[in-house]
Amino acid sequence: MRLTIKAVLAAVLTLCAGSVALAQDQAAPAAPIPAGPVPYTSLERPARPVRPAAPRPAAIRPAPAATATSTAPTAPIGVVPALPVTPSGARLAPAETLPPAELEAFVDGVVRSAMARDHIAGVTVSVVQNGQVVLKKGYGFASLNPARKVDPDATLFRVGSISKTFTWIALMKEIEAGRIRKDAPVNLYLPERLQIRDQGFRTPVRIVNLMDHSPGFEDRALGHLFERNFARERSMDEYLRQERPRRVRAPGEVASYSNYGAALAGEAVSYVSGKPFERLIEESILLPAGMRNTSFREPHEPKSGIPGAIPRRLAANISEGYRWTPSGFEARPFEHIGHIAPAGSASSTAADMARYMQLLLNGGVIDGATIYGPGAAQAFRTPLRKTPAGISGWRHGFIEYSLPGGRTGFGHAGGTLSFLSNMVVVPNLGLGVFVSTNTETGGDLAMGLAGQVVGQFYAPPQAYPRPGSEALKDQARAFEGYYLGTRRAYRGLESIVGLATGGTTVKVDGRGRLVTTNFLGAKTWVPEGDLAEGRFISTTGSEHLAFKMGDGRAKSFQGAFGDQTFERAGFWKNPSTAMTLAILTGVAAAATLAGIFLRNRREFRETPVQSRASLIQNIQAALWLTMLILFGLWASRTGDIANVMYGWPGPFLFIASACALVAAALTLATLLLLPAIWRGGRRVDSWTPLRKLAFSVTVLLYSAFAVVLWFWGVLSPWSG
């Protein structure tokens, strides 16, 4: 989740106004792979912000899409030569290999279009098939000042959560060797100081729960997952001790993506092997596989307790990360992730990732070197639990992808604040696709390229949009409602972000289509099969939704990616409820303070109790207004996710939370005073009935707002 509160507020307004379907009835694009998880607390990466294009200075911002470094044969840009059509309608049969020239022309068109549209500084791509590198190419710039082009053989991109796949390979090697059991409690393989606490749950978290992301942890990241100031960097041991997430459900219940869980897996492997994690990965995977331009280490000065730095020859070739602004590309500081290295600290080149995909497609063997055995190879192609048709599962840590044409693959997506990457291998095509971008707006390209390649060459054409269903219109109430994702923080200030951005509103429109709306936008779906089964497919692609039904009503649903479950949520967790109460509270508070100056004091009478109650309510009004203003100031700075991630929670949000806490506490006092307020009704020196009614309504409004803020974690400034 890119935590832009602008997007959050836009989502809330959308929820308040009602769901609006996107214009998906246009000519359908090639079906993209569902957006994958990123190593920070986002449920999904938010949509690309719409920003005006800016003129580029010649030396500082060269047009990234205009330059490419390639090892594949050149072809006319944007021209895809015609291929014969197979009986299925696909351009190639499964046994046929991709023509390099046609593939390069197609990828060139997709990448350069995305770079121009989304303002991406640099992209690196590699495609392998049947043991050969079919395409290896760099586009744009790894650095804009000084200018340095992307070299697919030398330029390292941060691959984010793709790092986890190396962790799962290391873990499966220990399982194959018999030193770790997949069904054993994780605590057996952790030092006592890092062992998972019960926290009220009797069932222990097992190794397999880490591999399918079902340990039952909440997901927290703000203020600690990334670090830009190396002086604040901690060892992995220290990080895992200090940033323990709460256990919010029993292990094995549902998959809910967990960076902390992946880090525990890496720590377990390190503890059992007796080697530091970075060295273990180098000795057991990277060096034997010939991946000499890949590293989990990071550039930094020597520091006690921190793994050694990345070799200088590699550090000099790491790409810069960028953010697009109206004035041009803005370079990001280096993102340190070494404290949770198994979850996301790897950097690699397109060439090395090509070797890695060949390793995965060849069952753990490359150039005669066996990195992992047949047991692990089979595990990475076998889902750990059954999922509904079209919903991705977990293949012992690897993501199972549903691709166009009914094909499946496995791999992983990844992202940092600036880098967006994806790697997908498709065994029945002998195909692997890797792509990484160095700008925060590169998510659409990264998540969609592999699916576009498969769809372009190996899937028959489809007719879109799919028509709606009259039966769905009749059963709309069974599905409509507000659903909240399980991948979020459950307490404290960080829960604000999860509640504000992690929900989805489900409606049925007049054309018999299911419409899902969240802060990323809206999508439309139609039933696939019997409505009682709760399966839906996109009106314009191959993406699926699967609802869990009970007593004829939807209880929850899973998106195509399957990294979390969306459960029906009460109205108090709906952002529209919080927004409505916030507006009403602001109006009431302003009216209360205005009343101090507008009332005619010569005609105003009140009892001592009413005088004290009025004073308390005036203080409350000032606190509520201060809280709302400070929250607005905090929100105004969140257009850049770095401000949220590195500056969490920040003084504005902290003071706003403290004001809300005091105001909520004073609400208890005014509630207790309500009976005494009304008992003074017949005295001359008492409030009028209208004044008493206004006071009472305001008390009840403040009380409702305080209760909702408690559910949202706003009343705990100490737990940022």
Task: State what each model feature region is.
Residues 105-111, 125, 131, 157-183, ...:
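Active-site SXXK
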